[in-house]
Amino acid sequence: MLRTSLTKGARLTGTRFVQTKALSKATLTDLPERWENMPNLEQKEIADNLTERQKLPWKTLNNEEIKAAWYISYGEWGPRRPVHGKGDVAFITKGVFLGLGISFGLFGLVRLLANPETPKTMNREWQLKSDEYLKSKNANPWGGYSQVQSK
C-alpha cells in the first residue's frame, strides 16, 4: 500500500513542461556574425530565451537553436575571442624573419669591418706562458688551469 502510493506520486511529478515558444529563425540566423554588434539587452534576451528552451527535451530544439546555444556558450566572442586576427600571423612571421635578416646582416657587416688580426692573447705562445704562470702560482689546483684553446 505504501509502495503503490509512492510510485503514483513519482509518476505525477516526472516531467516539467515549460511554456516557451521557439525562437524565430530571423533572430538566430547568422548569430555568430551579428552577436558582437548586438546591444547587450538583446543579447541577454536571446540568451535567456535559449536557456528556457534548453530546459525542455533537446529533441524539441531545432538546429538553429542548438547552434546558437553552442555559440553563446562556447563561441569565439568576449573572452574567447582569438588573440590574433586573420592577417596577424603572416604579419608577425614576416616581421620576425625581417628582424632575423637584419640581425644577421648587421653581424656579418661588423665581422667584415672588424680588425682581421687576432688579439695577442689568442696566440698559442701567450696561452702556454699563461699556463706556466698559473702553475707557478698554484692557481685552481682542483679544476685545472689550462689556458690553451685547441684549434
UniProtKB/Swiss-Prot annotation:
Keyword vocabulary terms for this entry: Membrane, Mitochondrion, Mitochondrion inner membrane, Oxidoreductase, Transit peptide, Transmembrane, Transmembrane helix
Chain ranges on the Mitochondrial intermembrane side, renumbered to this chain: 109-151
An example Gene Ontology CC term for this record: mitochondrion
Localization per Swiss-Prot or TrEMBL: Mitochondrion inner membrane
Ranges per topology, Mitochondrial matrix: 18-85
Presequence range in chain numbering: 1-17
Membrane topology recorded in Swiss-Prot or TrEMBL: Single-pass membrane protein
Pathways involved: Energy metabolism; oxidative phosphorylation
Induction pattern: By low oxygen levels (hypoxia) at the level of transcription. Repressed by ROX1 in the presence of oxygen. Not expressed until the oxygen concentration is below 0.5 uM O(2).
Protein's job: Component of the cytochrome c oxidase, the last enzyme in the mitochondrial electron transport chain which drives oxidative phosphorylation. The respiratory chain contains 3 multisubunit complexes succinate dehydrogenase (complex II, CII), ubiquinol-cytochrome c oxidoreductase (cytochrome b-c1 complex, complex III, CIII) and cytochrome c oxidase (complex IV, CIV), that cooperate to transfer electrons derived from NADH and succinate to molecular oxygen, creating an electrochemical gradient over the inner membrane that drives transmembrane transport and the ATP synthase.
Family (UniProt): Belongs to the cytochrome c oxidase IV family.
Xref: PANTHER family: CYTOCHROME C OXIDASE SUBUNIT 4, CYTOCHROME C OXIDASE SUBUNIT IV
Extra remark: Present with 2250 molecules/cell in log phase SD medium.
Protein name, entry field: Cytochrome c oxidase subunit 5B, mitochondrial
